Amino acid sequence: MQLTSFTDYALRTLIYLASLPKDELTNITEVTDLFGVSRNHMVKVINRLGQLGYVHTVRGKNGGIRLMKPASEITVGGVVRDLEPLDLVNCGVEFCHITPACRLKDKLAKAKSAFLAELDECTIESLLSDNSELLILLARP
């Protein structure tokens, strides 16, 4: 299963925000410069993260973005569920001759459940914990 670039950038953004001191604001330009992402794309990502309650946005000259809840409460699995279309096949959308005897759908459902269960064990905080190399890469100049 491949995550969309939207989810990839959302996870990177959450990791970066979690690396900052508690309640410290950053801005979209800083995030786009760090990850080399277009501003337009990142605005959409951050808006969606805000709608979902992951990111708090502050408007105005001294505004910015920060995590809305502790990184220890944000699981990678939760973010993926919120952002990804998780249907691996389009069973039921179109007629398929083998549907009555097909076992693939159940196998794919089990694989998806195992994938998400693994990601549910991982919080944004755990990705930073004891990871000094990552913290150095994320540090502001």
Curated annotation (Swiss-Prot):
| Taxonomy, superkingdom | Bacteria
Mind listing where the DNA-binding region sits, in residue ranges?
28-51
Query: Boundaries of each HTH rrf2-type domain copy?
Result: 2-129
Pfam families found in the cross-reference section? Rrf2 (PF02082)
Q: What does this protein do?
A: Nitric oxide-sensitive repressor of genes involved in protecting the cell against nitrosative stress. May require iron for activity.
Q: Which GO terms describe its biological process?
A: negative regulation of DNA-templated transcription
Q: How is the cofactor bound?
A: Binds 1 [2Fe-2S] cluster per subunit.
Q: Which UniProt keywords apply?
A: 2Fe-2S, DNA-binding, Iron, Iron-sulfur, Metal-binding, Repressor, Transcription, Transcription regulation
Which cofactors are named for this entry?
[2Fe-2S] cluster
User: This protein is called what?
Assistant: HTH-type transcriptional repressor NsrR
Q: Give a Gene Ontology cellular component term annotated to this protein.
A: cytosol
Q: Where does [2Fe-2S] cluster bind?
A: 91, 96, 102
Source organism of this protein record = Vibrio parahaemolyticus serotype O3:K6 (strain RIMD 2210633)
Designated gene of the protein: nsrR
Q: Which GO terms describe its molecular function?
A: 2 iron, 2 sulfur cluster binding; DNA-binding transcription factor activity; double-stranded DNA binding; iron ion binding
